Design a protein with these regions (language model features):
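Hydrophobic faces of well-ordered beta-strands that scaffold small-molecule active sites
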Residues: 2-8, 42-44, 69-73, 92-94, ...
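Conserved anion-binding
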Residues: 8-22, 89-167
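Catalytic domains of carbohydrate-active enzymes, especially glycoside hydrolases
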Residues: 31-45, 153-155, 159
Length: 226
């Protein structure tokens, strides 16, 4: 399944390269809402909130009312998750909140699942140089993606793996890594990071892995009708 991505920063849709350099910027929200309306799921990320530089909550609420969204970025508490679901999000994405003092926070994961239901939770694994990155990808931990999946999979409905090293480059995601992750969990697995062609989507589909695509859609390299 192809999941279009909407990344928000400063009240606009943006696309970043490897989470740092801004490559594209749009404010034609209505056009993208219409274009994405046929998809069963859209990913909505508040980059400002993820980086601790404000938020785009009002805009997120507008999108979530009109599109079936899983929403993430800066959700640090159970209350944050509950409030985002109340705005209309189908699911919420938790990432940095799952790491505490350099280790996976199983207690927080369990508390969140008890509060909103594991099926409403997507646990984000943002990987850079083989290690999980947190706080808007600015802080690198010693935890691997496989370790995070093993520790936390009983408390979520899906995992979202982002390969930061290839994010925004449109050069493909390493499929060997994806295969390892697929073998490690029975949960829904969603991946992101440089996916650029319909052929890649087909390969991932064959592995029962869903794909988040941003840059390739916004540049026109990947046509949504395919």
């Amino acid at each position: 399944m192809l999941i279009p991505s909407i990344d928000l920063m400063g009240g606009r849709i943006v696309q970043l390269v490897q989470g740092e350099r801004k490559a594209l910027e749009f404010d034609n929200f209505e056009e993208w809402i219409v274009r994405f309306s046929a998809f069963p799921l859209v990913q909505l990320i508040d980059l400002d909130a993820a980086m601790g530089k404000g938020n785009n909550r009002t805009l997120i609420g507008d999108f979530a009312k009109r599109l079936p969204c899983q929403v993430g970025g800066g959700l640090r508490s159970v209350r944050d998750a509950e409030e985002m679901l109340a705005t209309g999000a189908r699911r919420v994405i938790l990432g940095s909140a799952l790491i505490r003092n350099g280790a996976t926070d199983r207690a927080f994961a369990e508390t969140a699942a008890s509060a909103v239901g594991a099926d409403k939770l997507v646990f984000a694994i943002d990987s850079k140089q083989g290690r999980v990155a947190i706080r808007g990808w600015r802080e690198l931990t010693s935890i691997t993606a496989l370790e995070m999946i093993t520790a936390l999979q009983q408390w979520c409905g899906a995992f979202l793996y982002t390969h930061i090293d290839s994010e925004g480059l449109m050069q493909g995601i390493p499929l060997d890594t994806v295969r390892q992750l697929r073998q490690s969990t029975h949960k829904q697995l969603i991946v992101a990071g440089g996916i650029a062609t319909a052929e890649e989507i087909a390969e991932l589909d064959a592995m029962k892995v869903d794909a988040v695509v941003g840059m390739a859609i916004y540049t026109g390299r990947m046509k949504l009708g395919r």
